[in-house]
Amino acid sequence: MKPTELQIGDWIGRVSDDKCIIEDYRQVDWIRTGEIGMRYQKVWSIGCIEPIPLTYEILKKNGWKDAEFWCEYQEGNNSIQACLPDMRGRINGIDIEHFKCEYVHQYQHLLRLCGLNELADNFKV
């Protein structure tokens, strides 16, 4: 994973020396060459982090519900339908076809692109 793939507020996981993912997830607070600053945590080197796989369980934790062919999120004017893993669906009427979205931080980027910054920044893992 490279620092250029990340944005402030993205969720990532810390890995141990043997590269096994630890259930220690943090949001990126700042980024500089070779280091990532975490919220409420010390600095992590870029070699110590891994992306968090996006799963239906994580979507459901964030208010998504099962629909016939996908998960669906409805709140106010926001309407999202998502079909993993190739991310077919719609976000507020915008067709999303085969957007590469295997990881939580990629989904956060997609939400931000569609103007859903608050939802992206408050995403839970």
PLM-predicted stretches and their roles:
Residues 18-48:
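Basic/aromatic-rich interaction segments and small domains that mediate binding to polyanionic partners
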Residues 40-65, 100-114:
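Intrinsically disordered, low-complexity, charged/polar segments
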Residues 63-85:
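Amphipathic, interaction-prone secondary-structure segments
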Residues 80-102:
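Intrinsically disordered, low-complexity regulatory segments enriched in Ser/Thr/Pro
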Residues 115-125:
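Charged phosphate-binding loop/patch that engages nucleotide di/tri-phosphates or the phosphate backbone
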